[in-house]
Amino acid sequence: MPKLKTKSGAKKRFIPKKSGKVKFRRAGVRHLATFGKTKKQKRHLRGTDHLAPMDAKKIKECFPYAR
């Protein structure tokens, strides 16, 4: 039986962790310095976050060899 392939779109956007959570980077960060974003918005866009459990379940299906 051939190896299962990981979805290339998912591997560019998500990182499955050993704890079972899925890490991702927030959208809207490409032009953080542009006008129209408040300090609070920029602060919340910084760093990474984890997906909700139901969304994480769907994304994990894209990673056949993730634990």
Curated annotation (Swiss-Prot):
<dbReference type="Pfam" id="PF01632">
    <property type="entry name" value="Ribosomal_L35p"/>
</dbReference>
<comment type="similarity">
    <text>Belongs to the bacterial ribosomal protein bL35 family.</text>
</comment>
<dbReference type="InterPro" id="IPR018265">
    <property type="entry name" value="Ribosomal_bL35_CS"/>
</dbReference>
<dbReference type="GO" id="GO:0003735">
    <property type="term" value="F:structural constituent of ribosome"/>
</dbReference>
<dbReference type="InterPro" id="IPR021137">
    <property type="entry name" value="Ribosomal_bL35-like"/>
</dbReference>
<protein>
    <recommendedName>
        <fullName>Large ribosomal subunit protein bL35</fullName>
    </recommendedName>
</protein>
<dbReference type="InterPro" id="IPR037229">
    <property type="entry name" value="Ribosomal_bL35_sf"/>
</dbReference>
<keyword id="KW-0689">Ribosomal protein</keyword>
<dbReference type="InterPro" id="IPR001706">
    <property type="entry name" value="Ribosomal_bL35"/>
</dbReference>
<dbReference type="GO" id="GO:0006412">
    <property type="term" value="P:translation"/>
</dbReference>
<keyword id="KW-0687">Ribonucleoprotein</keyword>
<dbReference type="GO" id="GO:0022625">
    <property type="term" value="C:cytosolic large ribosomal subunit"/>
</dbReference>
